[in-house]
Curated annotation (Swiss-Prot):
Keywords recorded for this protein, A-Z: ATP-binding, Ligase, Metal-binding, Nucleotide-binding, Queuosine biosynthesis, Zinc
EC class: ligase
Upper taxonomic lineage: Bacteria, Pseudomonadati, Pseudomonadota, Gammaproteobacteria, Lysobacterales
Cofactor binding description: Binds 1 zinc ion per subunit.
CDD domains, A to Z: QueC-like
Name of this chain's protein: 7-cyano-7-deazaguanine synthase
Species in which this protein is naturally found: Xylella fastidiosa (strain M12)
Job of this protein: Catalyzes the ATP-dependent conversion of 7-carboxy-7-deazaguanine (CDG) to 7-cyano-7-deazaguanine (preQ(0)).
EC numbers: 6.3.4.20
Length: 230
């Protein structure tokens, strides 16, 4: 069987991507990054998901992006309830570039030619490293910057959720047997994984379940507007 490295954050998108990769016959090696995020319960979720999906291997790698700063997800910066114009304060500088680079390194070591990530360009919050152009550019980089790429192995970066709405992602996850109750998406999630219900991530998640007509298993401390209107 072919091997693949999947970036597994602990959120719903990466859980669905992990299940998709397995359904395509890949031996899944899941990679989670402890980068200094304040919502550390998502890493606990990543461990739960990896166990539930019975992945071949799961690594949690430490990268201290908090020492660099520049994001409300790592710094003591207020996380807004509503998104504003431009790139939001929850953007972590170069995060996806760094994470994909780590995934690329592990892929080269284990002999995997495929990397999967859960970036989404439809319901994304304005992050530049969630755009299709970024994924295409990184795949080009991967083939230029690695020993295996130079020697002729074609490396692929897959973003199967790239053009799906959150509702479509919910349906895709259910189709592949994902237990969304194991996942954590909230930027302010507490140590037990309970979601705030107010941040942009919570709103997108709740709206996705509502639009899909599926019960949201998330434990919210405060119900998002999309659920209050049901």
């Amino acid at each position: 069987m072919k091997k693949a490295v999947i970036l597994l954050s602990g959120g719903m998108d990466s859980a669905v991507v992990t299940a998709i990769a397995q359904s395509q016959g890949f031996m899944v090696h899941a990679l989670s990054i402890r980068y200094g995020q304040r919502h550390t319960s998502e890493l606990d979720a990543a461990v739960r998901i990896a166990r539930a999906l019975n992945v071949v291997a799961h690594k949690v790698v430490d990268v201290d992006l908090r020492s660099i700063g520049g994001s409300a997800l790592t710094d003591d910066i207020e996380i807004p309830d509503a998104g504003g114009e431009g790139i939001p304060v929850t953007y972590v500088p170069a995060r996806n570039t760094i994470m994909l680079s780590l995934a690329l390194g592990w892929a080269e070591v284990i002999g995997a030619a495929d990397i999967f990530c859960g970036v989404n360009a439809v319901d994304y919050s304005g992050y530049p490293d969630c755009r299709p152009q970024f994924i295409t550019a990184f795949e080009t980089l991967a083939n230029l910057a690695t020993k295996v790429g130079v020697e002729g192995t074609q490396l692929h970066v897959h973003a199967p959720l790239q053009f799906l709405s959150k509702a479509e992602i919910v349906h895709e996850g259910l189709l592949h047997g994902v237990d969304f109750g194991l996942t954590v998406s909230c930027y302010r999630a507490d140590v037990d994984g309970r979601a705030c219900g107010r941040c942009d991530a919570c709103k997108l998640r709740a709206a996705g379940f509502a639009d899909a007509g599926v019960v949201d298993p998330t434990r919210y401390m405060e119900l998002p507007c999309s659920l209050l209107l049901l």
